[in-house]
């Protein structure tokens, strides 16, 4: 899962361009995952990456390091919540047709245990809960290398269709 993470996050930029807008969302995500399309800058900054993609389900992997430390010496809760928000959004993106995007309306999360920096690779799995014409909801769980639950959350996303 984490063997070639540096390959996966070596290219940073915007994956959604006029050219990629002709592709289904799942193909864009697969391109980001395999390195043919750039990873979002936030992923490089917080050291997480897409490790699995299928329709309605996305898995991110990430390793919190020194860049994620809060003033008390633990990993800032924002690291977990950012992974949850990213994974939930990408789960929604995985079902979108070409030319259709999304934006997060709300993400709620619960942190269930503290994360220590440099404690290994964490896994954030997101799945769709409901798919409507304009609103998608998804949920995610963040588990540690020990298999324990560290956080969970849900996102409400709005589908953005081209105007005109």
PLM feature spans:
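Terminal targeting signals and extreme-terminal segments of soluble enzymes
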Residues: 1-164
């Amino acid at each position: 899962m984490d063997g070639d993470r540096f390959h996966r996050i070596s290219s940073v930029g915007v994956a959604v361009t006029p050219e990629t807008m002709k592709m289904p969302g799942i193909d864009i995500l697969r391109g980001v995952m395999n390195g043919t399309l750039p990873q979002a800058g936030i992923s490089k900054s917080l050291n997480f990456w897409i490790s699995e993609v299928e329709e309605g389900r996305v898995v991110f992997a990430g390793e919190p390091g020194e860049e994620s430390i809060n003033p008390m010496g633990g990993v800032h809760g924002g690291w977990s919540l950012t992974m949850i928000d990213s994974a939930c959004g990408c789960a929604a993106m995985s079902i979108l047709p070409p030319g259709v995007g999304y934006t997060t309306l709300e993400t709620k999360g619960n942190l269930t245990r503290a994360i220590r920096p440099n404690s290994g690779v964490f896994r954030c799995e997101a799945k769709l809960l409901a798919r409507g014409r304009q609103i998608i909801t998804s949920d995610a769980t963040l588990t540690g290398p020990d298999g324990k639950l560290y956080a969970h959350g849900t996102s409400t996303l709005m589908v953005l269709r081209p105007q005109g």
